[in-house]
Each structure stands twice: as C-alpha cells, then as structure tokens.
C-alpha cells in the first residue's frame, strides 16, 4: 500500500531575478506519511513549511527530488483528486452564503447536485454552523470562516486532508468541535496532514510529527516518543521546609505546581526514597509519574540546537 504522502530528497531553490541570489527553501526533505495517520508539520517562520505544502498541491515545482501522493507524482492532476485543502489565508466570496459557497465548491469537485444537496447540511452541522447556512459569509467571524473553510475542504469526502492553521481564530469550544470532527475522520481512515504553529493543538491531535528548520528535517517521530522524558516526577503538598531541603539535594529539578512542591528524580530508586521520606513526614503525595516534556519544549530545544 503506497504512503499517502512521500517525499525523497525534496529541494526547492528560489532565485532573485535581479540579483541572481539563491534561497534554498527546501534542502533535501525526505518524509513519509502513512495512510490513515494524523501527521503534524512544525517549524519556525521561514522553515519551508508553506513551500513544502505548495509542492504537494502542485502550486510549486521542486528544483530536485520527488513528491508523491498515494503513489502518484504530485504534479499529476489525478494525484490531487483525493485531496481536501484548507489554506491559511482563504478568500471566500463574501456575498455568498455558507450553503451556496459549499455547493459551489462541491460542483468544482465534480459532485452531482443530489450529492451536494445531501452533503452540505451534513457538513454545516458537523462544523457547528447548521443555523448559519443561509447567512452571507461577509457576516461570519474569523472563527466561523475557518469552520466553513474546513467544511469546504471536506465536501468531496477526500482521502487526504491538508490543513494549514485550521483552528486559527477559532474559540476554545470551536476548537474542541473541530478536533472531534477530525477524530471522526481519522476513525474513518482519512489521512490528516496538519501544518500549524499551535503546538498544543498538534500535541493533542497528531500521532506523528516532523520539525523542519532551515529547509531540513530536524526531528521526526511519534509524539508520544518525542515527548517521553527521563526520570520520575513526584508532586506533594504540605512539605516541611526541612524535608524540602533534604529532597532538593537529590532532585534533578524542583518547582512549584498548583501550590504543591514538584521534584524530578533521575531514577526510580531516588523517587522511591523520596516517597518514603514524604510519607514518614506525613506529607500529602499528590502524584508520582514518569517525567515528560511538552511538544513545545521539544520544539524550542530542537530549533535552538540547530
């Protein structure tokens, strides 16, 4: 079974027509996104994320290397048929209603009138806009435009969904609703490729991520593996100062969390001894767990090390 997305040594060089100066936006990107996966592409501004997506959509041609969609060359028109796309900056006609806009984009995708008639209300309800279908887009908020934009990308039931900042400007309730819809699509086997600066959203939703920096892959892997830390985290309440001093000497790091004292130990033995000491001092132990990092911490570390 071919990968949903696969690139091999992808290079893109932009040349200034006046100065002749070259800018290497992509410098040998090799990535594989398996069918049915949820994949997040991360990177600082100017890392090459947008250029990478443009090549997948055949809006730009690579200088070198190859990109395929479900085994077909990304430049092949047939490769784009199973793709649904939500750009970061979309410009839908403001005089259209949500319903008429979705109907229009469905027709561009080759959907029949009966199929569009059935699909439009289903999607409007799915993105929480069932009561706004007959309202002109000019009266939609930014978050509402993002949600109807997602519905547009889903009109023709794509096998691969490429989303560029899908929750930008969306309120917390709307984000939860969008995540729920995306999880449903994931369960249906849709491959979801997410390009976002919201690392917390990527961490909540994606199973696999790649961080690119200066046109190269700096790190890739499963989110759970990349955020797995080393050591053990012990959180306790009502810890006397004398006990804190004793544990500070053994703990790798210490801190405060929710009014409690947090200790991180390098190994299980130190953590067990700390728990025994806290219990003997009649402290309230709130939690003992493996230490972990957030995706944001991993991202910052990788970018600063490059």
Residue ranges and their predicted role:
Residues 161-165:
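Catalytic Walker B motif of ABC-type/P-loop ATPase nucleotide-binding domains
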Residues 65-81:
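Conserved ABC transporter NBD signature motif
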Residues 231-305:
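Short, charged/small-residue-rich alpha-helical element at the C-terminal edge
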